[in-house]
């Protein structure tokens, strides 16, 4: 799909790069699904230093994305790639931040709630993001100042269907105040934050979701706030942050109320709130 077919006036500057990372995300998603749909295949599950799981699907997806971005003028920071020292990274004006398989635990649980995340970050700010949900054949993308969109993907051809602008108009009609939280990492601090919200929103409804789907729910307008008082890394949020920003939302440090920044010396995110 040529992204400019949606509205060429919106993508004059970044159109080729946006199309490149969308196609990379779709191909990476296909590589993941080729493994996911064959449970008899050896998924080669390993444990990383932080005890989080790593699978064959993570590695295959990373290889697809790294190859797609090889000719890009920007360096790549991927969860599954080499993490260069900050003394080198601090000179990067722009870079790609990638999670080839966000939600590996969800992948292993076979609950379909895993994603491919690709973001372009400039001067610490995510300016473009793509999230593909391969098991649901749903694509999200956004660019700073140009809007955010979602579309279905044909499972056979990977053709992208009609784009819908985010937030979805119908998503905010006649529904309770909705909080989305992690399916696998709901911390006591996050629960305290949610309980405080209940005092002001008696109709509060809690929705659990895996991976960067939580940020997508905010961008769609299907949820109002996403608190995360638990460890995350920059590649977990960069793409969703870009999409949420493009849809008119904020991703803020829970303590300082300032926007999250990227390509920091410490790649861990602080606790944050998306609203």
Model-based region annotation:
Residues 94-131:
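Glycine-rich active-site/cofactor-binding loop and its immediate structural neighborhood
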Residues 32, 58, 69, 104, ...:
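Residue-level signal for inorganic ion chemistry
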Residues 119-215, 264-275:
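Acidic beta-strand-loop-alpha-helix segment within the catalytic core
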Residues 75, 128, 224-225:
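Short, Asp-centered acidic motifs that coordinate Mg2+ and/or phosphate
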Residues 7, 11-101, 192-195, 256-258:
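N-terminal subdomain of lithium-sensitive/metallo-dependent phosphomonoesterases centered on the IMPase/IPPase/PAP
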Residues 7-26, 191-200, 207, 213-275:
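Oxyanion/phosphate-interacting regions
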